[in-house]
Amino acid sequence: MAAAAGRSAWLAAWGGRLRRGLAAGRRAVPTRGPLAAAVAGVALAGAGAAWHHGRVKAAAREGSRTVSAQKNYLGPIEKLSLRKQRFMQFSSLEHDGEYYMTPRDFLFSVMFEQVERKTLVKKLAKKDIEDVLSGIQTARCGSTFFRDLGDKGVISYTEYLFLLTILTKPHSGFHVAFKMLDVDGNEMIERKEFVRLQKIISKQDGFKTVKTNETEYQDPTVKEPGVNTTLQVRFFGKRGEKKLHYKEFRRFVENLQTEVQEMEFLQFSKGLNFMRKEDFAEWLLFFTNTENKDIYWRNVREKLSVGESISLDEFKSFCHFTTHLEDFAIAMQTFSLAHRPVRLAEFKRAVKVATGQELSDNLLDTVFKIFDLDGDECLSHGEFLGVLKNRMHRGLWVSQQQSVQEYWKCVKKESIKGVKEAWRQQAGKGPF
């Protein structure tokens, strides 16, 4: 109870600082633009859009060598997957030809589609990276971990994919992959096994490549970072001597999901400790380019009452639901095959089956009013799922025909490969 009150006070205080830095006003049809960028900039750094500009000046004062990222990747970037493009756009560090993100870069990458003003990429020597990582082991390991680190961290592309997947999947699959690599049965893995875990979980993450008229370009082979990274130091220490227990890993997953949820809540609530329903609609539709978007916004204007809001707890419960979209989609197939519309009671039951939890009537009523395309008080669930997938994948999702069973089948296959390799290294030759 005391912890909840403390968090509410912290959010309220932070929200107060945000409100003082923002202009009042309501948008009839919200759009992604400079205001949204300014809001989240203030939320992250307390200085709004000036953060990017200030970082460039600070780098110049320190005499650090910088290189322009655009010169290195703008040419072939169209041939990269959506996720690689996003990584390259937001990464701000470079070492030995490889690009890296800071924790702040990662938070920005999941909140925005693009960088409005790309700063120069800072080129680091190995000693510089060691200095950047020096404070990780003493940082608080709660739901403000990435915010507390700010620019004091290094995230590789492999880890970026891994972190994205954590934000879109339930915990159960991670436990399966973790146990498959735990050859000793003590729910603990070493650093080299964690590298395999990242690849396994990221193997089928829904962030597919961009398709062109000619071919489908694949990401280049992901190289292992030649330096320590934030996650490696956090889990295994600077020298990699520690082991990672599943309970600690699960706490990290839960804290990361909570941190991003709180960041997005503050971004779209404009720093308040509640989110207006029209703000919630803006969050839902932020990464969506569906042809029915105008209808959704008409529903927001005509069906949602002024002054109604969504609490932080309600927002978190909805985000928890979105990590179970595959299970929810299976429940919805019953209605699709029967060509039946989905009514409120049926939707509520499907959510409970998929997640084991219930959404509040306030949330359900809001969702139904937004996604009722025909005015029949039923949910257009097919397009609703597409909107949610785009929202949770931050605009990086490409529609594909893959069931949840196929996803975990692939995870199991990759896990078995990791087990075989672990046995070979442990026993000299594998028993398979």
Curated annotation (Swiss-Prot):
Ligand binding (Ca(2+) 2): D372, D374, D376, C378, E383
GO cellular component, one term: mitochondrion
GO molecular function: calcium channel regulator activity; calcium ion binding; calcium ion sensor activity; protein heterodimerization activity
InterPro entries named in the record: EF-hand-dom_pair, EF_hand_dom, MICU1/2/3
Positions bearing Phosphoserine: S202
GO biological process: calcium import into the mitochondrion; cellular response to calcium ion; mitochondrial calcium ion homeostasis; mitochondrial calcium ion transmembrane transport; negative regulation of mitochondrial calcium ion concentration; positive regulation of mitochondrial calcium ion concentration
Major location (coarse): mitochondrion
Keywords, sorted A to Z: Calcium, Disulfide bond, Membrane, Metal-binding, Mitochondrion, Mitochondrion inner membrane, Phosphoprotein, Repeat, Transit peptide
Binding site residues for Ca(2+) 1: D182, D184, N186, M188, E190, E193
Protein location: Mitochondrion intermembrane space; Mitochondrion inner membrane
Domain spans labelled EF-hand: 169-204, 224-259, 290-325, 359-394
Known partners and oligomeric status: Heterodimer; disulfide-linked; heterodimerizes with MICU1. Component of the uniplex complex, composed of MCU, EMRE/SMDT1, MICU1 and MICU2 in a 4:4:1:1 stoichiometry.
Similarity annotation: Belongs to the MICU1 family. MICU2 subfamily.
Function: Calcium sensor of the mitochondrial calcium uniporter (MCU) channel, which senses calcium level via its EF-hand domains. MICU1 and MICU2 form a disulfide-linked heterodimer that stimulates and inhibits MCU activity, depending on the concentration of calcium. At low calcium levels, MICU1 occludes the pore of the MCU channel, preventing mitochondrial calcium uptake.
Name this protein carries in UniProt: Calcium uptake protein 2, mitochondrial
UniProt organism field: Rattus norvegicus (Rat)
Gene: Micu2
